[in-house]
Swiss-Prot record:
GO terms for cellular component: host cell plasmodesma. This is P3N-PIPO polyprotein. It comes from Pea seed-borne mosaic virus (strain DPD1). Pfam families: Peptidase_C6 (PF00851), Peptidase_S30 (PF01577), Potyvirid-P3 (PF13608). The record marks 397-398, 856-857 as: Cleavage. Potyviral RNA is expressed as two polyproteins which undergo post-translational proteolytic processing. Genome polyprotein is processed by NIa-pro, P1 and HC-pro proteinases resulting in the production of at least ten individual proteins. P3N-PIPO is cleaved by P1 and HC-pro proteinases resulting in the production of three individual proteins. The P1 proteinase and the HC-pro cleave only their respective C-termini autocatalytically. GO terms for molecular function: cysteine-type endopeptidase activity; serine-type peptidase activity.
Length: 1096
């Protein structure tokens, strides 16, 4: 600003009108245009680069070193740029604002001056200086000029700010609308927008309403400050702002102890060895691929070497520190000394401890020894660098495959013909697939275990030609199937093998089967036999065909003819006499017992984790046998309806051969022939697995003495049984199933086929879900249903073989034979041999008596022995549960038939109705068992009818009238609970008593039972009150409240119904006496109803 003032006062000009400036003074210094200080550089001479105090007053009028405007004549042509013109215009405007007036008339910049007519300035001569200003004029002009410049600067900056913020406002308007309903929070990653919670939105609304209530709007405004007169504003100064630095958080390093690292190494390598996987060990950008290898029964680490990859180098391998640590971890576990002769092909890369190898060996750099091969009988270390000539003398222990490939490649190239095709060969089959093709073809024509074995070659050549042809035919079929699945593009090989198979097989077949078919059904031309004879004649006419399907067609035709012949005979007879159910001569195959991974070195089944989880069966459903007491306690196995003699006593072997032969004679029962009890039908056809086994003549096959074994699980119902060692227990004692739980051996046999990972869930499910539902001596239908449930959850158990199951038709019992055999003979044998066949008993469409047989016997004897005791105990438990919700819930969920024992007393029925017991039970079984829910609904209706009656004899009559219907509903419900037979027995007793009383009354006798019923009811009615008084105060209050509410609701309904009944009776009486209805009588229904309501 001071510069503009100086420019307005005086300026040197040249004659041509151009502005000039003294760059340096006489002393050669640069001068400041404000304070006239001298500097050595032009940069420091600028006012902004030093503490400039401005020009002094005394120096102002004498200052002539500034670049000032030229005063030019009007006739002098001036060529100026647009920027210079604009600057002169601003200076002129500033002079006009300050009110400065030049002498006579002159212009600044392009303004013409007419001081004289002639040119006032010659070339290189300064123009005349205007008159000297006083101190006050200079101060006033400075102040006005400063204010004008400040005002124009503020206006320009305001316009720029508004322009900049208008653009920013447009960009941020959409974002501000989006963020209106949310909040911006600061997180570790920066600022984030989140949707505002209801409380935050409420706070924003309150703050908005508070601002609106004031009626004031805050707008940005500018505050101007007056500066001192001795200072001049040079505009804003750019200031540096602080920048938020990103904080880099270093991840915490994981530190493990040596023991933890060893455990980690052991677990990782164990998993890798179990699944035959390779592990890559990385340490400081050096990697080693390793795996587990057993050498002489010891687990050691094997490292991938260069000659594994087909690279022969002087130094075969290198180990990083981590690999060395893992190798030492495995090598130090054993002190076994490995002879050098036992280390052979396949052991290259195995890491031993050098001290654990005996024999000739090369040196090693540390205590480890990595096998490479042998040279002159000496073991070579892979990490040692060998000479070039010695490298090819080493017999590497894994280079056999490379030798085969090199020989094959060289021979194939030598034998192939020159290419005469018109195309370029393109590789479409990988070398690995070529190796598979060569192996398959070699296996078809050359079935040797090792291709280098001369003994295998001799054995193959010694076989007859027919066996060799048969092998090529069968093996070729397997090769075709394998190649079609693995290498679909190898159709040229499969086509040639198939062509060879068709040629080597004899195209003719034996016509003996056709002759047998003609002998069987040739004379019959009715129905389907006419078509069968036509098919037989067509086959005879097509003899000599080259396809193999004709032979299978002959065999199928023969079986079809036999089946139709037998079926026709059976339908014609229409009886059981034609039933044949021969047992298979071959034992069924159980693949779980054939898997090598589940067998030990002796071929015995290895339970693994299954044996550990099988303890749940032993602890709950088995009893220990103490050999010290002898086996006499277990020789006779009692059942509820009889006994069965076990062969456990035969484990004691006498020295006398005669006595030993006597033990082979069993205890025979009465033999029973084949009848309808022995068969099961579905849709009119026999279901053979659910029927008894017969011989070829139709007679039943009877069981013989079954020899015992010690600590074995005997499975297999046909053929020779299979013995599986029971899981080893801590005590090592013998176990026998508890009475009524002999069917646990079926689930034990299913455990063999369950995988180890599912063994825990399987045993828990059987113990906690299946066994409580079945209980003691369940029916075969219930056992089959449980097996069906397990087969859905664990599909592997469908093929599980069953123990031998014997059938006793006289007592309607199934005996599941365990390892202690049976001395009792004469039982029928059930044909079902697998779980899937046993599940057929669960079908509702299956007809036959055997599905209702008990597995172990019925419960009649047990019920008769302690019927009264158990019934009284259950009634007492039921009364206690009326006012105890937890006990009541347990009874409802486990034994719902206990609720039916409430029919022994009307007071128990009324108490259960008032407490809502039946309603709770109905809700529980509504979607679980509809028959059970219907039975409970009938009990609720019966208890309501009993509650409405006030007379004891009438209440008993209501109960007696509903007994038959209640029994029919109970028969349709689930019968797997333990209390079902007790309830059924109580119902039978009450029904027989009612029928006997009715016969006595019909014959004219008087039945006096009122006093007995009153005494029983008096005794039972006190028990609910007695148990109610024993409850806690809070429980008593809650129970009384529930009873009060239910009684109030019930008597409100009863009172209304009785009132309606009484009004109906009164209407009939009024109409009969007065000839009109009581509503027309002065003593209307309102008064009568009011009086009656008072009475009731």
């Amino acid at each position: 600003m001071s510069t503009l003032v100086c420019q307005a006062v005086a300026a040197p000009v040249w004659s041509n009108g151009a502005r000039t400036r003294r760059i340096r003074d006489a002393d050669g210094e640069y001068r400041c245009t404000q304070c006239d200080m001298g500097f050595d550089s032009m940069t420091m001479a600028r006012p902004v680069n030093h503490c400039c105090d401005g020009i002094m007053i005394d120096e102002y009028n004498l200052y002539d070193d500034d670049p000032i405007m030229h005063l030019v004549d009007s006739k002098t042509p001036i060529k100026r740029g647009s920027q210079e013109t604009e600057g002169d215009g601003m200076a002129a405007e500033a002079i006009k604002v300050t009110g400065a007036e030049p002498v006579n008339c002159f212009m600044v910049g392009t303004i013409k001056c007419k001081i004289n007519e002639n040119s006032i300035v010659a070339k290189g001569v300064m123009a005349a200086i205007p008159r000297q200003l006083t101190q006050d004029e200079v101060f006033m002009r400075k102040a006005r000029l400063q204010a004008a410049v400040a005002k124009s600067t503020i206006e320009r900056e305001e316009k720029e700010r508004q322009f900049a913020f208008s653009k920013l406002e447009e960009k941020l308007r959409a974002r501000r609308e989006k963020l209106k309903d949310g909040i911006v929070i600061k997180t570790r990653k920066g600022l984030e927008w989140r949707e505002a919670t209801p409380n935050q939105q409420r706070g924003k609304l309150q703050s908005t309403s508070f601002d609106a209530s004031g009626g004031k709007t805050l707008t940005p405004h500018t505050i101007y400050c007056k500066t001192k007169s001795s200072k001049f504003s040079n505009g804003g100064v750019k200031c540096a702002t602080s920048k938020k630095m990103r904080t880099v958080r270093k991840p915490q390093s994981l530190k493990m102890k040596t023991e933890s690292i060893d455990v980690l190494i052991e677990q990782v390598m164990t998993i890798a060895g179990k699944h035959a996987k390779q592990v890559t060990l990385i340490d400081k950008q050096k990697t080693n691929r390793v795996w587990i290898r057993r050498v002489n029964g010891v687990r050691l680490l094997q490292v991938e070497t260069k000659h594994h990859k087909g690279i022969i180098s002087q130094k075969d391998a290198s180990l990083n520190n981590l690999t060395k640590r893992v190798a030492r971890h495995f090598a130090r576990k054993t002190a076994y000394i490995h002879p050098s002769d036992s280390i052979t092909h396949g052991h290259s890369g195995v890491v031993f401890l050098r001290a654990n190898i005996s024999g000739s060996k090369s040196y090693s750099i540390d205590d480890l020894f990595v096998v490479r091969g042998k040279r002159n009988g000496k073991l070579m270390e892979s990490r040692n660098k060998v000479a070039w000539r010695k490298m090819f003398q080493i017999d590497h222990f894994s280079i056999v495959g490379i030798k085969i490939w090199n020989a094959f490649d060289a021979e194939y190239v030598k034998l192939r013909d020159e290419s005469v095709s018109d195309h370029d060969c393109v590789g479409g089959i990988t070398p690995e697939e070529c190796g598979i093709l060569a192996a398959q073809i070699l296996r078809v024509f050359y079935p040797c275990w090792r291709i280098t074995c001369t003994k295998c070659i001799s054995n193959w050549l010694s076989k007859p030609t027919s066996e060799q042809i048969e092998h090529i035919y069968e093996r070729g079929n397997l090769a075709i199937q394998d190649l079609n699945k693995r290498i679909p593009s190898a159709h040229h090989v499969t086509q040639m093998v198939e062509l060879l198979r068709q040629r080597i097989k004899n195209t003719t077949f034996d016509m003996g089967n056709n002759t047998k078919v003609h002998e069987l059904i040739g004379h019959r031309q009715d129905g389907v036999f006419r078509h069968l004879n036509r098919l037989n004649n067509s086959i005879l006419a097509a003899n000599g065909s080259s396809t193999i399907e004709w032979e299978s067609m002959n065999e199928s035709l023969l079986e079809l003819a036999r089946w139709h012949n037998k079926r026709t005979e059976s339908i014609a007879s229409g009886g059981i006499s034609s039933f044949r159910n021969k047992i298979s001569a071959k034992a069924q195959i159980n693949f779980a017992l054939m898997c090598d991974n589940q067998l030990d070195t002796n071929g015995n089944f290895v339970w693994g984790e299954r044996g550990y989880h099988a303890k749940r069966f032993f602890s709950e459903f088995f009893t220990k046998i103490d050999p010290k007491d002898g086996y006499s306690h277990h020789t006779v196995r009692a059942t509820p309806t009889g006994v069965r003699h076990l062969a456990i006593g035969n484990l004691i072997i006498p020295g006398d051969l005669q006595k030993l032969r006597e033990k082979l004679e069993g205890v025979s029962i009465t033999a029973v022939g084949i009848s309808e009890k022995c068969v099961s039908r579905r849709n009119g056809d026999f279901v053979y697995p659910c029927s008894c086994v017969t011989s070829e003549n139709g007679k039943p096959v009877l069981s013989d003495v079954i020899l015992p074994t010690r600590n074995h699980l005997v499975i297999g119902n046909t053929g020779d049984p299979k013995l599986v060692d029971l899981p080893k227990t801590e005590t090592g004692r013998m176990w026998i199933a508890k009475e009524g739980y002999c069917y646990i051996n079926i689930f034990f046999a299913m455990l063999v086929n369950v995988s180890e990972k599912d063994a825990k869930d399987f045993t828990k499910f059987v113990r906690d879900e299946i066994m409580p539902q079945l209980g003691k001596w369940p029916t075969m239908m219930d056992v089959a249903t449980a097996c069906y449930k397990l087969a859905i959850i664990y599909p592997d158990v469908r093929d599980a073989q069953l123990p031998r199951i014997l059938v006793d038709h006289s007592e309607q019992i199934f005996h599941v034979i365990d390892s202690y055999g049976s001395m009792t003979t004469g039982y029928h044998i059930l044909k079902a041999g697998t779980v899937s066949q046993l599940i057929s008993f669960a079908h509702g469409a299956l007809l036959g008596e055997m599905k209702m047989y008990r597995v172990g016997g019925t419960q009649k004897m047990e019920i008769n022995m302690c019927c009264c005791q158990r019934k009284n105990l259950l009634i007492k438990q039921l009364i206690r549960a009326i006012y105890r919700p937890k006990l009541l819930t347990e009874i409802i969920e486990t034994e719902p038939f206990v609720l039916m024992l409430a029919i022994v007393s009307p007071s128990i029925l009324k108490a259960m109705f008032r407490s809502g017991t039946f309603n709770q039970a109905i809700k529980f079984y509504m979607h679980r068992s509809k028959p059970t829910a219907q039975t409970l609904a009938f009990l609720e209706a019966l208890s309501e009818r009993v509650s409405r009656s006030r007379v004891l004899s009438e209440q008993f009559n209501i109960i007696d009238g509903a007994l038959k219907e209640l029994k029919s509903l109970a028969n349709m419900s689930m019968r797997t609970q333990h209390t079902y037979p007790i309830v059924q027995n109580q119902l039978d007793i009450m029904i027989e008593r009612v029928s006997a009383d009715a016969e006595l009354l019909r014959d004219g006798f008087v039945v006096s039972k009122g006093r007995v019923q009153a005494l029983i009811e008096k005794k039972l009615s006190r028990r609910p009150e007695k148990f109610l008084h024993r409850l806690a105060i809070c429980t008593t209050i809650a129970t009384n409240y529930v009873i009060f509410k239910s009684e109030a609701w019930f008597w409100r309904i009863v009172r209304k119904q009785r009132l309606e009944l009484f009004q109906g009776s009164m209407d009939g009486a009024f109409e009969l006496i007065f000839g009109r209805r009581q509503t027309d009588h002065p003593l209307g229904a309102h008064k009568v109803a009011a009086d009656v309501s008072k009475w009731w």
